[in-house]
């Protein structure tokens, strides 16, 4: 049984944790998904930008068990935009599960995925990410930080396959390892699937965009602990998918 069969699309979704959520049955073309965990002070900026992009049919924020009012800030930032849906998970499930939950809750054939803590994001960045996929020039785009913060620029230069800024055809998610995609392994599972299946992947430079270095938003040693957890989940995903062998040769070829 495929993962998608577990949650009928366009119907009531009961995430692990028991909070009922619903997205209306409709025929959207492009949905933006923003997984968020305790992102007050950051999520509002991202939602505000997305509300300025008319090409988006749905804006889905997954409040992944936040305790700081993340979902409420997203609602306030939307200024009543009817495209916004908040999926609230009662306990933190991790980034991968949050993204998969949103995927199950939308009928859109194209997905835009963005991190909740992006800084200096502009509407034109979003349009540059979605255009190659919507026009059939690429199966997936990946957004890489460029001339924003030297630390995050360096991170994306060294490990571009870990970026959380992507647009892709939704049906491609049927081909990723759902087990490997849990937590912070989601991007790794997606990267491996792209390499193994020969997807056309196009890089998009997000000039001026960055996010806080990994340990700063959470603060102190707690943030360092989260960073260690993130990299352990990424490593686990690589081991489970054996994707590291094909990374340099196959994954990020230019769309032609």
What are these regions (language model features)?
Residues 63-72:
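A conserved acidic beta->alpha catalytic loop
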Residues 90-106:
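Glycine-rich, basic loop-to-helix element that forms the pyrophosphate-binding segment
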Residues 22, 181, 188, 195-256:
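Hydrophobic helical membrane-anchoring modules
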Residues 29-31, 58, 189:
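Cell-envelope/extracellular polymer assembly enzymes that use nucleotide-activated donors
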Residues 38-52:
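Short, well-formed alpha-helical segments that are part of the catalytic scaffolds
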Residues 111:
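Short aromatic/hydrophobic "clamp" motif used to bind/position activated sugar donors
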Residues 123-142:
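Conserved donor-nucleotide/metal-binding helix-loop-beta segment in metal-dependent transferases, i.e.
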Residues 141-153:
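Short beta-strand-to-loop element that shapes/binds the nucleotide-sugar donor at the catalytic cleft/hinge
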């Amino acid at each position: 049984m495929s993962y998608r069969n577990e949650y009928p699309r366009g119907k009531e979704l009961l995430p692990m944790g028991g909070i009922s959520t619903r997205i209306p049955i409709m025929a959207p073309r492009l949905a933006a998904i923003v997984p968020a965990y305790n992102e007050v002070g950051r999520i509002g900026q991202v939602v505000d930008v997305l509300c300025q992009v008319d090409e988006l049919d749905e804006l889905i924020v997954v409040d992944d068990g936040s305790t700081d009012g993340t979902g409420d800030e997203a609602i306030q930032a939307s200024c009543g935009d009817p495209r916004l849906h908040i999926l609230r998970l009662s306990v933190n499930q991790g980034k991968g599960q949050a993204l998969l939950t949103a995927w199950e809750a939308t009928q859109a054939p194209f997905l835009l995925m963005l991190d909740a803590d992006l800084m200096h994001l502009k509407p034109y960045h979003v349009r540059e990410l979605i255009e190659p996929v919507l026009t059939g020039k690429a199966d997936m785009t990946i957004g890489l930080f460029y001339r924003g913060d030297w630390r995050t620029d360096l991170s994306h230069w060294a490990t571009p396959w870990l970026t959380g800024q992507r647009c892709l055809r939704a049906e491609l998610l049927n081909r990723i390892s759902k087990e490997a995609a849990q937590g912070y392994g989601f991007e790794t599972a997606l990267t491996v699937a792209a390499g193994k299946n020969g997807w056309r992947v196009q890089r998009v430079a997000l000039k001026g965009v960055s996010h806080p270095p990994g340990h700063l938003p959470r603060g102190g040693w707690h943030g360092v602990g989260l960073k260690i957890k993130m990299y352990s989940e990424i490593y686990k995903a690589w081991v489970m998918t054996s994707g590291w062998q094909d990374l340099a040769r196959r994954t990020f070829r230019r769309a032609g």
